[in-house]
């Protein structure tokens, strides 16, 4: 945790009363009301620990937003020291669109920008599965074999997303190890965001998807 305290203030549309949720992560939480006039919506304030002040660096914040939340539907704006806002994420996820609406050029650009490739993929596989478990996968087979393809310790290169939020790029078991030359993403709405990486790794949902 980077914050020693979190304060969430929320005001419902059509009302003037705000509710405040506070927690230090150690002694539960406290909810109180506030009659102070506030704008409709929710604000979240993090009171950073002294050893986490580097998270106030704008470049670091933008990098973190780009890594973990680049593809969520809501734009994330970061204000600089001059109070000027700049959108830090693309707020788009190519894989959520129907494959019929995506051009080969768009697939190639995504492949290059996401996986650092220099040429177009040899083959792409784009599927959406709906049912008791919902997930989308966008997989690429590169034209050029990775230089470390035959290294036993090479990890698979399929990144896991939950509701468009990046979780990890080295979750074991998503695809067999002999397919470690395959690169791509797996996005599911059937896993919870508030679980640890270890629980995701051992999730029966992930095993069924695999």
Language-model-detected regions and their locations in the chain:
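Membrane-protein biogenesis/insertion across secretory and organellar systems
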Residues: 64, 77-92, 97-98, 103-104, ...
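GHKL/Bergerat-fold ATPase module
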Residues: 73, 86-98, 134-210
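Helical mechanochemical/support elements of P-loop NTPase systems and associated helical scaffolds
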Residues: 2, 40, 57-61, 103, ...
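Short alpha-helical segments and helix-capping/turn motifs at coil-helix boundaries
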Residues: 28-29, 60-62, 119-126, 168
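GHKL-type ATPase core
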Residues: 1-87, 162
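Extended, Lys/Arg-enriched charged tracts that mediate electrostatic binding to polyanionic substrates
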Residues: 104-146
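A glycine-rich phosphate-binding loop feature that marks nucleotide/adenosyl-phosphate handling sites
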Residues: 23-24, 81-84, 127-132, 198-203
């Amino acid at each position: 945790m980077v914050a020693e305290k979190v304060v969430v203030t929320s005001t419902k549309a059509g009302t003037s009363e705000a509710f405040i949720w506070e927690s230090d992560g150690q002694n539960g939480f406290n909810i109180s009301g506030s009659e102070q006039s506030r704008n409709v919506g929710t604000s979240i304030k993090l009171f950073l620990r002294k050893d986490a002040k580097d998270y106030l660096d704008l470049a670091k914040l933008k990098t973190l937003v780009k890594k973990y939340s680049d593809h969520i539907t809501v734009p994330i704006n970061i204000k600089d020291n001059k109070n000027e806002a700049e959108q830090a994420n693309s707020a788009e996820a190519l894989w959520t669109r129907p494959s019929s609406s995506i051009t080969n050029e768009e697939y190639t650009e995504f492949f290059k920008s996401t996986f650092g490739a220099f040429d177009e993929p040899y083959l792409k596989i784009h599927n959406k599965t709906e049912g008791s478990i919902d997930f989308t996968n966008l997989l690429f087979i590169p034209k050029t074999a990775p230089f470390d393809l035959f290294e036993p310790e090479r990890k698979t290169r399929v990144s896991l997303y939950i509701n468009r939020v990046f979780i990890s790029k080295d979750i074991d078991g998503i695809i067999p190890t002999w397919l470690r030359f395959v690169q791509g993403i797996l996005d599911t709405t059937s896993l919870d965001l508030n679980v640890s990486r270890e629980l995701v790794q051992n999730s029966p949902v992930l095993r069924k998807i695999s």
